[in-house]
Every structure is written in structure tokens, then in C-alpha cells.
């Protein structure tokens, strides 16, 4: 190894002090590098089953965040199995080691989104065949519930992700009566997992407030920092907006749907202009 070679070099040659100091620094650096490589090599590589009702190239935050998560896990050497609904468009940005596809139905009032049918036997066999170390359920819909039961039947630990406040969404679709039942279901669901990943401290506090008692872990959403980088800033684009370098630009990136409350953003923008 490089570190031991440097040590031998010290013993064999009578270097002047400046060179000895340099070689000593290099020796320490090489030892740290070797330890880092060794630690990385010894890290366990997991087999992870990820269950989701939505997946890229569907346009929503859950699908985008999950794609970045899967890419990152795979890059670290973990093996990924995806259990998800059949899609109309195929994702070309990521290839899981295994996939289990179930039938899908469109979500009411969300024609471009769908949920997975609870095909228990198919999901259970897929999990048994892959034999994952953990099953991570991203969405709490019919497919997520099916995977929860299947994983428990095979005595495999289940973690979950809390991405969407479905209980809050209900009030935007004349479904206010469903807020409490949905809240109760979400509480039950996450309390039957070994831990739940949340995107922020605010979400963590909200889940604790309505009774989620399983361990909650804050996990930030994945961002492609190469694609989204200040070096891509375009003065030509700002000129088309009639904005110079000192102009404050308020930008919304996301779907246009009632629960996004884009009207609040527009009103905020108008209030800012008045100041």
C-alpha cells in the first residue's frame, strides 16, 4: 500500500528537512485516503425494494425526487428493485436490477397520475424472489398497503416516505369529510413501519402532532446540482422577462393544481410590487 511504501522511503533515505516534511504530509494524506477507501469498501451494500405509485417521467415532485434517490443509491452500490404501476411512457433515466409492474388506474381529477392495483400475490412473490434487506414504501396508496402486508408476511423491515399531505389535499376537492379518515389511515400506516423519512423539520413536527410515533428521519430531497447550477444563469432569458440584474424575479416551478395554491404566490407577488 502507498502509506507503507512511504514509510520505507523514510527509512532508506536521509532527505533534507523540507522534503521530509513534504513526504510526511503526503504519508498522512495517503493513510487517510487508504482508510477512506477501506471504510467505503466495508460499508454494507443493501438490496432495497422501493414501492411507489408514481415514477419518472411522470411530472410531479415525488417522481422526480425518487428518481434522484434511486440514482444515488445505485451509484453507492446498492441493488434496487422497483415495484410500481405500468406506465404509458417508459423511464429511460434509470434501470433497476428488478421490476415488478402492477395494473394501474387513473386517480380521479388527476388524469395524468395513477395508482397501483393491490395485486398481493404478484407483489409478495416479487419481494420473496428479490429477498431485500428493506422494503421502502414511498406512497401510501393501495400498492403501498399491499407491499406493507407482503413485507410483513416475509418478516422484512419496512421503511416509508411521507411526500404528500393527502389529508390537506382533500379540502381542495370538496372532500373535507375525508380529512379525518385519511389522517387516521396515514397515522396507522406509518406507525406500522420501522421509520418514516420526511422532507423537512416542519413535516416532522406535523406528523408528530397528529400521532405518528414511529421514528421520523429528516431526509432532504435529491437535486441534480450539475443540471441546476448558477452557471446556467441566462441574461438573455432575464431580458425576455424585462428583468435586469437587480430585478427581483419570483418563479414558480410545479404543477398547476388547486392544492399548490398558486393564487397565494400571485397575490404575494402583487403585494411585493406595491412595496
Segments and roles (model prediction):
Residues 2-103:
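N-terminal subdomain of nucleotide-sugar transferases
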Residues 51, 199, 252-254:
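Short hydrophobic "strand-cap" motifs at the C-terminus of beta-strands
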Residues 157-159, 168-188:
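Nucleotide-sugar donor phosphate/pyrophosphate-binding loop at the beta->alpha transition
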Residues 84, 100-103, 183-233, 243:
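Donor nucleotide-sugar binding/catalytic pocket of nucleotide-sugar-dependent glycosyltransferases
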Residues 37-46, 232-249:
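Nucleotide-sugar donor-binding and catalytic loop/hinge architecture
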Residues 108-137, 143-149, 153, 180, ...:
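An amphipathic, basic-hydrophobic alpha-helix
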Residues 244-260, 266-270:
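Conserved donor-binding/catalytic core segment of Leloir-type glycosyltransferases
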Amino acid at each position: 500500500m502507498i502509506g507503507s511504501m512511504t514509510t520505507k522511503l523514510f527509512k532508506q533515505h536521509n532527505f533534507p528537512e523540507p522534503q521530509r516534511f513534504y513526504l510526511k504530509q503526503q504519508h498522512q494524506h495517503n493513510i487517510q485516503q487508504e482508510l477512506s477507501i477501506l471504510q467505503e469498501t466495508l460499508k454494507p451494500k443493501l438490496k432495497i425494494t422501493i414501492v411507489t405509485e408514481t415514477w419518472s417521467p411522470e411530472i410531479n415532485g415525488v417522481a422526480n425526487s425518487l428518481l434522484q434517490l434511486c440514482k444515488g443509491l445505485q451509484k453507492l452500490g446498492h441493488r434496487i428493485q422497483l415495484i410500481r404501476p405500468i406506465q404509458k411512457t417508459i423511464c429511460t433515466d434509470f434501470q433497476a436490477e428488478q421490476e415488478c409492474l402492477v395494473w394501474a388506474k387513473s386517480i380521479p381529477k388527476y388524469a395524468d397520475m395513477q395508482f397501483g392495483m393491490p395485486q398481493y400475490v404478484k407483489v409478495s412473490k416479487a419481494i420473496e424472489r428479490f429477498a431485500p434487506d428493506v422494503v421502502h414504501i414511498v406512497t401510501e396508496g393501495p400498492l403501498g398497503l399491499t407491499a406493507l402486508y407482503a413485507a410483513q408476511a416475509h418478516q422484512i423491515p419496512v421503511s416509508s416516505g411521507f411526500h404528500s399531505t393527502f389529508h390537506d389535499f382533500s379540502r381542495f376537492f370538496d372532500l373535507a369529510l375525508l380529512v379525518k379518515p385519511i389522517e387516521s389511515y396515514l397515522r396507522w400506516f406509518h406507525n406500522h413501519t420501522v421509520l418514516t423519512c420526511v422532507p423537512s423539520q416542519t413535516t416532522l413536527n406535523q406528523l408528530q402532532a397528529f400521532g405518528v410515533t414511529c421514528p421520523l428521519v429528516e431526509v432532504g430531497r435529491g437535486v441534480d446540482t450539475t443540471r441546476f447550477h448558477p452557471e446556467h444563469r441566462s441574461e438573455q432569458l432575464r431580458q425576455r422577462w424585462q428583468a435586469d440584474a437587480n430585478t427581483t424575479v419570483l418563479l414558480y416551478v410545479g404543477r398547476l393544481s388547486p392544492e399548490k395554491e398558486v393564487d397565494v404566490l400571485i397575490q404575494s407577488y402583487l403585494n411585493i410590487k406595491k412595496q
